[in-house]
């Protein structure tokens, strides 16, 4: 079984409704393997190219632009790697409970 880590680089805020993370990746740096147990979205704060690897062995490469908002999939084990030449960052918002 794969050891899972945090969904972001730094936990910024948490209450009963949301959890907000910062994710910062230098070129060729990867996040921890992780699982989002809730619905979530992320907002790109420094654009770049990410490779997403899933626990089932599949992967994808995505170009992400400044300010882009992406809804993520709850329940998939994955990690992302910055395959670009510049630093990449985003803000992740996990939706814990409905408002």
Predicted segment positions?
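Catalytic phosphate/metal-binding cores of nucleic-acid and nucleotide-processing enzymes, i.e., regions
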Residues: 2
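A short glycine-rich, His/Asp/Glu-containing loop-to-beta-strand
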Residues: 5-33, 39, 92-93
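Short beta-strand His + acidic residue motifs that chelate non-heme Fe in jelly-roll/DSBH
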Residues: 31-33, 51-52, 77-84
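Short, conserved beta-strand element in jelly-roll/cupin
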Residues: 35-51
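Short acidic-glycine-tyrosine-enriched beta hairpin
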Residues: 56-74
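Ligand-binding loop in jelly-roll beta-barrel domains
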Residues: 74-98
